[in-house]
């Protein structure tokens, strides 16, 4: 019969289990919940943005910096991990920070573990929006990940991209390499593959996971579990042409929408314009005739005396 576990042994086993779960869930944590991608409101301009060392809009330093690795705003003296020893019970503000991350542009506290591990494990290392190709330093908003293709997205394009992400770049759901129905879909390549053509010599399939895409290696998903479509949806701020300064907005989108909406009625509009032009010409002709008649009526009773036109001028010359 096994020995009964003591209280200290139970606590140690529970602690080891919690640490194991934390290590396992650290790689699968949501990008929006990372401390380096947390929401921050500037103390000076009151504008909400991503967690940064300096405000993106007014370049002011925050009163309570947030560590990009552990997310704390206060460093306690009890923790012996501090690189910079502080005399007080705790330290806040600039006395707590130790570095600025080059990837996420956020403060890192002066803890030895955070300083040595954050730069290698920063989730925003290659965070460039797949739609507008802007990085962390190019805009002030937070970074998100598409729930389908897992590419990085900025705040401006996250909803529009995810609304149009489940669209294949093909007219059918057939496999790219053959005519059989594609049972697995890669949402990065926007293509379907059958069971035979998902097997790749380059990318190996891990246990308990879906087969990788033979083109890019991204994990595929079953087509039946997705709301896949083969139509091309044209909407959003990225569909319009760029302006002179390189920026694109919603003006081109609304113009395209209006042109598509009234494209079917253009033929009828042209006919109506022709009829209106003919009516205007007829009205002008009638108006011209009426004006001539009115002018003739005005000059009928006008008497200019004896003139050459009246035929009496030669009598006056003879008298003289």
From Swiss-Prot:
Residues 1-23, 206-250, 264-303 are annotated as: Disordered. It is found in: Nucleus; Nucleus, Nucleolus; Chromosome, Centromere. Disulfide bonds: none annotated. The keyword Transport does not apply. InterPro entries: NOA36. Residues 10-22, 216-225 have a biased composition (Basic and acidic residues). A zinc finger (C4-type) spans 42-58, 67-104, 129-149, 175-189. Residues 269-287 have a biased composition (Acidic residues). It comes from the Eukaryota. One of its GO terms (cellular component) is nucleus. A motif (Nuclear localization signal) lies at residues 3-11. GO terms for molecular function: zinc ion binding. The modification Phosphoserine is found at residue 291. The keyword Transmembrane does not apply. Keywords: Centromere, Chromosome, Metal-binding, Nucleus, Phosphoprotein, Repeat, Zinc, Zinc-finger. Belongs to the NOA36 family. This is Zinc finger protein 330. It comes from Bos taurus (Bovine). The lineage of its organism: Eukaryota, Metazoa, Chordata, Craniata, Vertebrata.
């Amino acid at each position: 019969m096994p020995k009964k576990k003591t209280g200290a042994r139970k606590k140690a086993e529970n602690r080891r289990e919690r640490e194991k779960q934390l290590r396992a869930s650290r790689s699968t944590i949501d990008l929006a919940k990372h401390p380096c991608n947390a929401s921050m409101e500037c103390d000076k301009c009151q504008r909400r943005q991503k967690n940064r060392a300096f405000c993106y809009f007014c370049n002011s330093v925050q009163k309570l910096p947030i560590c990009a690795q552990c997310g704390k705003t206060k460093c306690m003296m009890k923790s012996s991990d501090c690189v910079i020893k502080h005399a007080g019970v705790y330290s806040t503000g600039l006395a707590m920070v130790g570095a600025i991350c080059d990837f996420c542009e956020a403060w890192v506290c002066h803890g030895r573990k955070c300083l040595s591990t954050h730069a290698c494990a920063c989730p925003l290392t290659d965070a460039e929006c797949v739609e507008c190709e802007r990085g962390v330093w190019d805009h002030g908003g937070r970074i998100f990940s598409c729930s389908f293709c897992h590419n990085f997205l900025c705040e401006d394009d996250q909803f529009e991209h995810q609304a149009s992400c489940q669209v294949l770049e093909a007219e059918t759901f057939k496999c790219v390499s053959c005519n059989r129905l594609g049972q697995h879909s890669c949402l990065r390549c926007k293509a379907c593959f059958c069971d035979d053509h998902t097997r790749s010599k380059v990318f190996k399939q891990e246990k308990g996971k879906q087969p990788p895409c033979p083109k890019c290696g991204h994990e595929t998903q079953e087509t039946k579990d997705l709301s896949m479509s083969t139509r091309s949806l044209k909407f959003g701020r990225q569909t319009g042409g760029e302006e002179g300064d390189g920026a694109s907005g919603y003006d081109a989108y609304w113009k395209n929408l209006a042109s598509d909406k009234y494209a079917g009625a253009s033929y009828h509009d042209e006919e109506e314009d022709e009829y209106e032009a003919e009516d205007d010409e007829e009205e002008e002709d009638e108006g011209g005739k009426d004006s001539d008649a009115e002018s003739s009526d005005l000059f009928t009773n006008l008497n200019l005396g004896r003139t050459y036109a009246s035929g009496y001028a030669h009598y006056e010359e003879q008298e003289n």
